[in-house]
Amino acid sequence: FGNASMYGGFCLAYVAYVSLKNKITDINQLKEYVELTFSPERVSFIKENIGNLWNVAIEISEEYSEAALLATVLWWQLQGNRFMGECETPQSVIKLANEILQISNDKVADFCSGIGSFLVSAIEKSPESQFYGTEIVRDVKEVSAIRTELISDRVKIEQKSVLNIKDNLMFDKIFCDYPWGIKAKDSIGSNEALQAIYDEIPEVQKVAAGDWIFIINVMNHLNKHGKAVVSVSNGVTWNGGINTVIREKFVKKGFVEAVIALPSNLYSNTGIAC
């Protein structure tokens, strides 16, 4: 699936799947189907990444089975930048999160859902649950929406900052693999979201890194008896100063059930442990 675009291979596989699924063998008919069927955002995403390779998509649809193309779309891997939020969560972390969360007929969220790898896995384990994802990057959001829509009609993916989710949107289970290295001042969404976090633990105002803002935001959207898994850099667990005070408050409030140390080099684009 050669293409200069980061998402070119994914789009070729997806359009090839659409072509085969709907028995479309003409380039113009395929373009028309895409434009009439999908949202303007989806159409733009496909056109920008597939370029002039519509004929290649049709050729691929004639070469591979529907099952093979579906598998390619569902398990496509993104090689991105961990610190820009464009790095796929490792399958080992996803498997661990699913084991901890034990999703079963729950309302489930993936904050900073990326290309939807956790949601795809969670849907397979508990198709009767309801799923929600939020991702700020348009192209990444489209990838996750495409993948999850193919296997469930009980999922909603929104393009927005995870810190701008409605206050009354609550979940039974939350997974969050947020982008590391973001400063607190750069990670804030609305002023209301900022104030809610500061009201919960005021010391967060004095921390430069944005980690605690993402973590507390998860807690703000968790039901009373809910459970969350948040992937953090290991510095969150041992940084001194005001971070020590914040950790103590988390423990005293009963927010922490366990801390699991994971090895370095789990993520493809950083050797930092989590």
Locate each region found by the language model.
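Long recognition/docking surfaces used for binding and targeting
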Residues: F1-R82
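Short acidic (Asp/Glu) and glycine-rich catalytic loops that position anionic groups and cofactors
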Residues: K156, Q195-A196, K227-V232
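Short, conserved micro-motifs enriched in small and acidic residues
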Residues: S5-Y7, E88-S92, Q205-W212
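Conserved Class I SAM-dependent methyltransferase catalytic core
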Residues: K206-I272
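Short, surface-exposed amphipathic charged segments that create phosphate/polyanion-binding patches used
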Residues: D172, G271-C274
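Mobile active-site "lid"/loop adjacent to the S-adenosyl-L-methionine
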Residues: Y178-I213, G235
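Conserved S-adenosyl-L-methionine
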Residues: G80-K183, S233-N234, I246, K252-K253
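Acidic-residue sensor for enzyme active/binding pockets
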Residues: F10, E135, D211
